[in-house]
Amino acid sequence: MGHIEYTKKMSATPEALWAVVGNPNTWGEWFSIHERWMEEPPAVLAPGNKLVAKVVMLGMANKFEWNVASVEAPTTLTLTAAGMAGVKVEFTFEIAAAGDGSELSVQGDFEGALIKGALGKAVEKDGLKQLEKSLDALDALAAA
């Protein structure tokens, strides 16, 4: 099992961040592992929603069936997903006010037969790199 977590001070307000995070149609602009939707996503995220996407990590494509586990707008979103080769993931995004901007914390867990040993460590390393890149792009988009 792999685990990543990252917290970043964001210049955008919590409401501006939520407007982007909570809108699946923006994910291609900031969520770096997201390549494209394979099915039209819902306009508004609600518990139980299913979102089918092509994602890329470590240069490898995978089809993820994201499920919205919980939503507490505008502060928390938890997504779970099942992918090919038994890959399972869970991501939680938590947004809090911090001064003039926000603090965004993301935690992610990965598991599956392939995510062990050296490959598990590579997934964690790439996942953290992608998460940092994603949050930079998210802040720029939300603050625009």
Where would I find each of the regions flagged by the language model?
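Hydrophobic pocket/interface hotspot
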Residues: 17-21, 27, 51-53, 68, ...
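Hydrophobic ligand-binding cavity/cleft-lining segments
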Residues: 1-46
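Hydrophobic/aromatic beta-strand elements that line small-molecule binding cavities or substrate pockets
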Residues: 8, 64-70, 89-97
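Beta-strand/loop substructures that line and gate deep hydrophobic ligand-binding cavities in soluble
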Residues: 80-133
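Glycine-rich portal/gate segments that line the openings of hydrophobic small-molecule binding cavities
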Residues: 38-83, 133-144
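A generic structural signal for beta-strand entry/edge sites
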Residues: 3, 48, 74-76, 99-103
